[in-house]
Structure formats: structure tokens, C-alpha cells
Design a protein with these regions (language model features):
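Single conserved hydrophobic/aromatic residue that forms the stacking wall/gate
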Residues: 1-8, 13
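Aromatic- and acidic-residue-enriched segments that line the glycan-binding/catalytic groove
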Residues: 37, 70-82, 110-149, 231, ...
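C-terminal beta-strand-rich structural cap/linker in extracellular carbohydrate-active enzymes
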Residues: 432-463
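Ser/Thr/Gly/Pro-rich low-complexity, disordered linker/stalk segments of secreted
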Residues: 461-537
């Protein structure tokens, strides 16, 4: 068994998150002309009851502050984006969330600013004489950009619209820490999600962590990290949590490829980092909707059962609880960030099987501490069935999932009780000789708890007639999308199994990992590490002066000094091709 370890704040470990991209959800204009504020944020007030109804107890919302476009090119950290309203609107919104016992986490875009930020505008005006010259990285008056400023500078992601802050400058650190203090005093925010945390300076993050401890008890810092060893960020000195992109990839590809080995192996890989409390998700404002990503829409159920029961903190991206679709476009993320009206989904918890499932899982998680704090133990694993336990204080909760089009029988070691009850179906099974024998329906999941541990529950209903009705209603209310979501059953019927019988494959235990995915993460197979590179890193060079190949080799050399370097470790290094991220990684070695 693997026990979880708590790193710093326990504030959000028990929570289930809801994630809102406000400029998209409110239908705000794509470009900010800095005109009079329009209080679009107030249109999100009715969403608060919905967030609570589906069992979410924390809200990550952002970006929120004044910017010129998508929100990540901040021009004023202390003013709500005028397309969303006024600071008073934001203060009232947070207060309304708190009234419903929902914590609020802001998006903190501290790696870079927009070109309209006061410090950058001062450099444009005063050039070499600007007192803010060292607020940004590598300002060079011998260069130029497409904006014809007469100087060049370091940007983020190749976009000169996003000007990289010099986070090692004490003035910048103090300014951003003051921003955090302002957000707490003005808006009573409960935490911050740090954008692009994988390229933030580690000393800068330590300063943010010290400020977090100062401003509010259990103030929570969560970072956006794509690749790497998450324990470099999640520890007692830097962040409380980071985005779990490794599990995100495994959850959809593990179902699309009928490969639960990938998911189970990813969980072990993450546990070996130190049993961190990671921010788990199946979609967000940067990646395709899970309903679009799944080859078999019926897998919506087992995917979300795993999201809510595996170690970590679960998050639902707005709209995905309704089963809406969203396909990533080549030059725009607008399709991932649609405007929605909550009135169009007024009865979703009662009528939409996707929403009903999410609401049930949220309630189950709230009433089952083992899902937040319990140790993790794998019980049974094939490529199509997976069972594990979460154990806490002598109580064993058992989770079963099945990605096959047929039902499956499982015999599993139980806890010290006489009977278990399925929290999603209400089905009861006796404990016999220390085991429970359960049948897991096709393309479904179940959470088994000792009878009496759940004070009340409402089994999820997925009658075909209701689903067809929801499909018709959803097609009407989401007509602006390129393809309306087919609200299909989330627990398979006998008719579905019979219709697909010819597609059923014999049970396999070999790896069937995805051949294509958004990113590379550990899977249950021998990892073919990249061939050894001929580049030899000069360790006397500063990390900033090394190129990507040199940084990779320097990191591997540092790893070798701490012990054997496995093929998986090499692959993790070679998968990271971002210069800033590699610089921070190399600096993190002591």
C-alpha cells in the first residue's frame, strides 16, 4: 500500500474543483478596447448554485485581470478585466461563492505581462533610461521585433505579445507579492493557480510560498506544469500542487486503447514521486473536451469514476459535466471556451446522465474521506478491468472500473465489515471469506463502501428514454457548436453489448498503449530511451547560456550523481524541450 503525504496546506485536498474560463463562458469580446466596464461577471452568479449542486466545493477561475485579448497578456494585476466588470463585481462574486462554502482560486499570470503593462510602456517611452529596464528579461536595444519598438526582449512561447518578467529581480518579486496581498485584502481569494509554473524561477516561487503563508491560513498555490518530476515543484518550499497532465493523458488513452495498464502504471509512477496531492483533470481550457477525446462515449463513466477516486484533487471544466464537445483548432482555442447559459441546463442533474454522474461522484467524495486521505493499493488489473482500494482508519473503499462492452466479474479482498454497498447503484454485496464478488457492468465504474458508511445516496439513473430526451434538448441549446454532444448512456445496456459483440476482443494482458497522444508520459511497457546524444555539456556554463541539448545532458549528469539513471528518467528528460523549464530543472539540483 502507498500512503499519501500532505505537502503544506491541506485546504483543497478534500475539495472537488470546478474550473471556469470567464472570458469564454460570459461571451466577452475577444479584444479589449479598455472602454467602460461591462458587468458580465455577474452573469456567472447563477452558476454558483449549480457548482454546489454537482458537489464542487472549490472554484478555479481565470484569467480575470485587465488584458488586451485572451487574458494571459496582463496589463493591470489590480483591476478586473473591463470586459468582465469592476473590482466591486469580483468582490461580490467571491463573497457569493464563500456564502455557499465554495473556495475561490484565481489564475496568477506572473511569468509574463502584456505589452500594455505600465513597466513595459515605460521602457517604450524612456528606453535606456527607464527605471523598469531590469523588470524584463534580455531587453536589447540592438534588436527589434515585429512591433518595431526599436528593441527586442525575451518572450514566452515565441509570442512577443507576452513579455517575460525578470523574476529574479527583487523589485519584480516584491511587486508580485504585493499583488497577492492585494488580491487577498480586496477580494478575499483563497489561493492561486500559477500559469506557466514549469518556467517560473524557483526562488521566485519560494517567495510566493512565503507570501502565501503570510496572507491567509491554508492559502493554496497550484502550478501549471506539463512535463517533469512534479516533486520539484510540489514540496514544503514552493507549491502545494501542480496540474497532473500525466494522468490526464493516461485517462483518455487508457480507455481509447482498452489499456488500464497505462493508467495503473501512471499512478505508480506518480506515487513514486512522493505521493503528492496533484490537481487531476480530464480537460481544461487548453485541451480537447473529454467527450470529444473519447472514442467510445460510454467511457465517460469509468473515466470520471477514476478522476474522483484516484489519489489527487479532481476538477471539472465548465460544461463538460453536460457532455458537451470541444475540438482543439489549429490557431484558436475558442472552441474549447464557449459561452454557455446555465438556464439551458436547469434540470441537467435530473435529466442528463453525464451531469447526474458528476453530481453523484461529488457527493460520494464529500462523504468518503478515504477518497481524499486514504492510502492506495492496486487490487486487480487487466487491460479492460481495474480495481483498487483506498484505505483509511480501518475502512476500505473499493473502486472497480470496466472499459469492455461486456460485464465482468471480479473477486476482491475486502475490509473488515459484513457487507458493501455500491454508492452509484445502491447494490449490496456480502463479504465472504474476506472478499467481495462483484459484477461490474459494461463500460462503467462503481465505488464500494462498507454498508452504513454512506448516510445517503441517490443511484445514478440512465434510462434510455431520458438520454434520448436530453440529447434532443442539448442539440437545441448548443446549436452554436460544430457538433452537438450525443448524450449516450454511461452504463452499458445488454442491447449495446449485443450490438457490439463482434468487436469484442479476447482478454489481453499485453500493453496496448496509445500510438499518438498530446504528450508523452509513462506507460506499461519497456521505455525506449532516446539514443545517447553526442553533446557534452560544459557544466561551467551558466544554465541560461546552454542550449536545450546541453541542458538535457547536464540534467542527466546531475541525476547520475544521485544514483542510477533509468530509461524512464532519460525519456522524461528528452521529452522536455523547453529551454526555460530545463534551466529551472538544472538549477533545482543541490
Amino acid at each position: 500500500e502507498i500512503m499519501p503525504s500532505l505537502v503544506g496546506s491541506e485546504m483543497c485536498i478534500r475539495d472537488s474543483f470546478y474550473h471556469i474560463y470567464p472570458l469564454g463562458l460570459t461571451g466577452a469580446p475577444k479584444h479589449n478596447d479598455y472602454s467602460a466596464p461591462v458587468s458580465r461577471l455577474n452573469t456567472l452568479l447563477p452558476w454558483i448554485d449549480h457548482i454546489r449542486e454537482i458537489g464542487c466545493t472549490a472554484l478555479y477561475i481565470g484569467p480575470l485581470f485587465e488584458s488586451v485579448g485572451h487574458g494571459y497578456e496582463t496589463t493591470d494585476y489590480k483591476k478586473l478585466d473591463s470586459r468582465l466588470g469592476t473590482n466591486e463585481d469580483l468582490k461580490n462574486f467571491v463573497a457569493a461563492c464563500h456564502e455557499k462554502e465554495i473556495k475561490v482560486i484565481f489564475d496568477g499570470v506572473f511569468n509574463h505581462t502584456g505589452r500594455d503593462f505600465f513597466a513595459f510602456k515605460d521602457i517604450q517611452q524612456n528606453r535606456e533610461h527607464s527605471r523598469y529596464l531590469n523588470w524584463y528579461c534580455n531587453v536589447n536595444f540592438g534588436g527589434n521585433t515585429e512591433y518595431n519598438d526599436g528593441f527586442s526582449y525575451e518572450n514566452w512561447g515565441g509570442y512577443n505579445l507576452l513579455v517575460k518578467l525578470n523574476q529574479r529581480n527583487p523589485e519584480v518579486q516584491n511587486y508580485i507579492c504585493d499583488v497577492i496581498r492585494f488580491w487577498v485584502s480586496e477580494f478575499d481569494v483563497d489561493g492561486i493557480r500559477l500559469d506557466a509554473a514549469d518556467v517560473l524561477d524557483f526562488d521566485f516561487m519560494r517567495a510566493l510560498r512565503r507570501t502565501a503563508a503570510e496572507v491567509k491560513e491554508d492559502f493554496w498555490l497550484m502550478g501549471e506544469v506539463i512535463h517533469g518530476d512534479y516533486s520539484r515543484w510540489v514540496n514544503g518550499e514552493t507549491l502545494h500542487s501542480v496540474t497532473n497532465y500525466a494522468l490526464h493523458k493516461a485517462l483518455y488513452s487508457g480507455h481509447n486503447d482498452h489499456n488500464y495498464f497505462e493508467i495503473a502504471h501512471t499512478v505508480k509512477y506518480l506515487q513514486n514521486m512522493g505521493n503528492l496531492d496533484l490537481y487531476n483533470f480530464v480537460d481544461n481550457h487548453d485541451v480537447e473536451r473529454i467527450y470529444t477525446k473519447l472514442s467510445n462515449k460510454a467511457h465517460f463513466a469509468p473515466v470520471h469514476v477514476l478522476l474522483y477516486t484516484l489519489p489527487g484533487v479532481p476538477s471539472i471544466y465548465y460544461g463538460s459535466e453536460f457532455g458537451i464537445e470541444g475540438k482543439k483548432e489549429k490557431f484558436s482555442d475558442d472552441s474549447l471556451r464557449p459561452a454557455l447559459d446555465i438556464k439551458d441546463y436547469a434540470d441537467a442533474v435530473q435529466k442528463n446522465p453525464c451531469t447526474a454522474l458528476i453530481a453523484a461522484l461529488g457527493k460520494i467524495r464529500q462523504h468518503t474521506p478515504a477518497l481524499s486521505y486514504g492510502s492506495y493499493a492496486e487490487l486487480q488489473l487487466t487491460n479492460r478491468q481495474f480495481a483498487f482500494a483506498r484505505d483509511l482508519d480501518g475502512i476500505r473503499v473499493i473502486v472497480t472500473v470496466n472499459n469492455d462492452d461486456n460485464a465482468a466479474d471480479m473477486s476482491l479482498p475486502a475490509g473488515n465489515c459484513a457487507e458493501y454497498i455500491g454508492t452509484l447503484t445502491g447494490r449490496k454485496v456480502p463479504v465472504q471469506d474476506g472478499r467481495i464478488n462483484v459484477t461490474v457492468a459494461a463500460n462503467s465504474g462503481e465505488i464500494w463502501v462498507p454498508a452504513g458508511e454512506m448516510p445517503e445516496y441517490i443511484p445514478v439513473k440512465t434510462e434510455t428514454a431520458d438520454i434520448e430526451k436530453v440529447q434532443e434538448e442539448t442539440e437545441e441549446t448548443t446549436s452554436t457548436q460544430t457538433e452537438s454532444p450525443a448524450q449516450k448512456t454511461i452504463t452499458a445496456t445488454e442491447e449495446t453489448a449485443a450490438a457490439k459483440a463482434e468487436d469484442i476482443q479476447p482478454e489481453k494482458t499485453a500493453d496496448t498503449s496509445a500510438t499518438s497522444a498530446e504528450s508523452s508520459f509513462p506507460e506499461n511497457k519497456e521505455v525506449a530511451a532516446e539514443p545517447a546524444k553526442t553533446v557534452i555539456a560544459d557544466l561551467n556554463k551558466s544554465p541560461e547560456d546552454m542550449n536545450v541539448d546541453e541542458l538535457q545532458q547536464a540534467i542527466l549528469a546531475k541525476m547520475a550523481g544521485n544514483g542510477p539513471v533509468t530509461d524512464q528518467m532519460k525519456k522524461t528528460v528528452y521529452d522536455n524541450i523547453w529551454h526555460d523549464s530545463l534551466v529551472n530543472w538544472l538549477k533545482s539540483f543541490h
